Amino acid sequence: MMEGLKKRTRKAFGIRKKEKDTDSTGSPDRDGMQPSPHEPPYHSKAECAREGGKKASKKSNGAPNGFYAEIDWERYNSPELDEEGYSIRPEEPGSTKGKHFYSSSESEEEEESHKKFNIKIKPLQSKDVLKNAATVDELKASIGNIALSPSPVRKSPRRSPGAIKRNLSSEEVARPRRSTPTPELTSKKPLDDTLALAPLFGPPLESAFDEQKTEVLLDQPEIWGSGQPMNPSTESPELARPFPTGTPPPLPPKTVPATPPRTGSPLTVATGNDQAATEAKIEKLPSISDLDSIFGPVLSPKSVAVNTEEKWVHFSDASPEHVTPELTPREQVVTPPAASDIPADSPAPAPPGPTGSAGPPGPPGPRHVPSPLNLEEVQKKVAEQTFIKDDYLETLSSPKECGLGQRATPPPPPPPTYRTVVSSPGPGSGSGTGTTSGASSPARPATPLVPCSTTPPPPPPRPPSRPKLPPGKPGVGDVSRPFSPPIHSSSPPPIAPLARAESTSSISSTNSLSAATTPTVGSSRGPSPLTMGAQDTLPVAAAFTETVNAYFKGADPSKCIVKITGEMVLSFPAGITRHFANNPSPAALTFRVVNSSRLEHVLPNPQLLCCDNTQNDANTKEFWVNMPNLMTHLKKVSEQKPQATYYNVDMLKYQVSAQGIQSTPLNLAVNWRCEPASTDLRIDYKYNTDAMSTAVALNNVQFLVPIDGGVTKLQAVLPPAVWNAEQQRILWKIPDISQKSENGGVGSLLARFQLSEGPSKPSPLVVQFTSEGSTLSGCDIELVGAGYRFSLIKKRFAAGKYLADN
């Protein structure tokens, strides 16, 4: 309780009365604080705290002497002062107890009658409220003195006690000082104030995390799906969100173990992941069955062998007779709407055998359709032999073409067979336009069975929405050529059932090991990114993917056997179907393949492509798309996959002429020295820039060699490698090999194995690698005419069956 607050001019600190009892007064500058005449004596701290409920150690007001304006009561709550500025214990009016803190009694009595007035200040606290049954307003006034962190929710203003002036009467001081009441505090006690504020500080953070978790749950498949190369084949609707947790979805098992090398140490058993990964890798490598005639029998008995036949067609060759085989159950299966769409630059698991990799042309006749493949074997092969994937949305970055968040969940494991998922029925058994082959796209015939008419009908008239051709560019009708292959009147227009147009990935190498190391971007569950007007050009993406198969025998370059196959895929945005619906007569899509002199066999899609066999330029081949068939096919796919974003369409398959070892991007030579107690292995490799149209690095290079003879210990392994004791295989991994590598991409791998059941028998070395940004054939593509534009042209190649023997 504070009373008798005096209103007087304070004297200078240094002036003191000589008769003052220095033993009974507190030091003004005690506790190391700045000297202040407003500090109460040390021995009065407990009493002041008990009476006023404030801190015993008062803070200086900081105002000069003679300042009578508003006082910051948070810093200064002074009892009465004497002439020299020393604190005096406040007394009740008329009190005779003499509690004057030993200050000058003469000075007090002189000024008390005419200078001193009484102010009754009662800072209300919890005990006072409970004892005196204080009103709500008094409770607010007392709580207002408590310094709390500002509430993030409640915005009630808090009036500072400093607004109380020293010349106010006790009536005015007792009146509540808040200008705005706080209804939230009316039912709370001061003791519960902290609890009442708990929801203001805690739950908002929790709710924010809850909202964030909810958002992550919804968006994470889109976030992690953009970089997640799961087993690419299909995407079932029930597995659209396979990873609902806050952690990123796990990558599929990589093809090589990641354990540290075990060189110079006793033989130990590798971990389960290493064993499974290495086993999967060695099983899938020798899986191109149609190359058995070149590379010999398949090395692994567990590999999937598919007998396929192919008919490579020269442009100069006459079209074979129409063959109308019976549709097998494989062909009759309609593509289920369970696959997500990946752009053209994203690869897909090709059917067994490299795309378009087949023997020389054979006589026309009925074809043998392979029976369905074993489920377990195909799942393993397709899941682990897909080629590296890339993104397509990066190219559709304009606001017209692409929206944010166009990402999708990683696809689930593949179906029983690739064909049963991606196949769709042909135009009709009587049309004579459909057959199948294991090495070509399962959704279309292996060979063009419908000849291009030599007397073509004129192209359709230019639609009013199509912009005029720029000067110097030939129109579609400038050259006499058919717009589409002739269609028998007894059959409906072909649907062009190109399977991988709606599969999760459409560019593949059947023997690549890099699917687990490269993210996939581009699939989406959202709407089509294509938003365009009638005068805009349609974005189209193209991708060349080539597979090199090679067999090296010892160090003799003349014994190297090489085969290179490739495919070209076009990718269309899903919104193109709406554009075609609004423009039923779109511009014909015409393109030419340039630098095609090295292409020995070119197999265009007979359902969608027309070619001019009379072209004289051997370095250029021109094609144009059967637009009615393309529109029909894309419409069908859009109905089956309304959430798809991209439609990938196989357009060309081809074979590249090879010049032996000079056509291999990585030359190999293996040397074995087998003894009863040990085996020495040396692998020499050389990066060959001459094999590529543009020198690019070989990525994720892996060397895998099985070693028999009961290996008990590894010695002198350079560089470090991973040994799988259960499968008796050693694996080297090199991130990349290029001209910038050590020694210009030339190096050796060395290893010595201690044997218990020697000698070892030399086994073939299996090599895998991928490369982006170049092709081995040097082919390129360019558009002819207007109405379309290339948003992306992707080029890549990878090792297929890449072997080296002693």
Swiss-Prot record:
Low complexity bias spans: 335-345, 436-453, 480-490, 497-520
Alphabetized SUPFAM superfamilies for the sequence: Second domain of Mu2 adaptin subunit (ap50) of ap2 adaptor (SSF49447)
Region (Interaction with DPF motifs-containing proteins): 539-545, 571-573, 645-648, 791-796
Region feature (Necessary and sufficient to mediate interaction with CANX): 627-806
Regions of compositional bias (Pro residues) in chain numbering: 245-260, 346-369, 454-473
Induction text: Up-regulated in the hypothalamus of obese mice.
Gene Ontology biological process: clathrin-dependent endocytosis; energy homeostasis; plasma membrane tubulation; positive regulation of feeding behavior; positive regulation of receptor-mediated endocytosis; response to dietary excess; synaptic vesicle endocytosis
Tissue specificity as recorded in UniProt: Detected in brain, spinal cord and cerebellum.
Subcellular location per the Swiss-Prot or TrEMBL entry: Membrane, Clathrin-coated pit
Composition-biased stretches (Polar residues): 265-276
Keywords: Coated pit, Endocytosis, Membrane, Phosphoprotein
Residues modified to Phosphoserine: 78, 104-105, 107, 149, 151, 156, 169, 236, 265, 287, 289, 300, 316, 319, 371, 398, 484
Repressor is among the record's keywords: no
CC terms in the record's Gene Ontology section: AP-2 adaptor complex; clathrin-coated vesicle; cytoplasm; plasma membrane; presynapse
Residues modified to Phosphothreonine: T180, T182, T247, T259, T324, T328, T335, T409
GO molecular function: microtubule binding; phospholipid binding; SH3 domain binding; tubulin binding
Pfam families in the cross-refs: muHD
Name of this chain's protein: SH3-containing GRB2-like protein 3-interacting protein 1
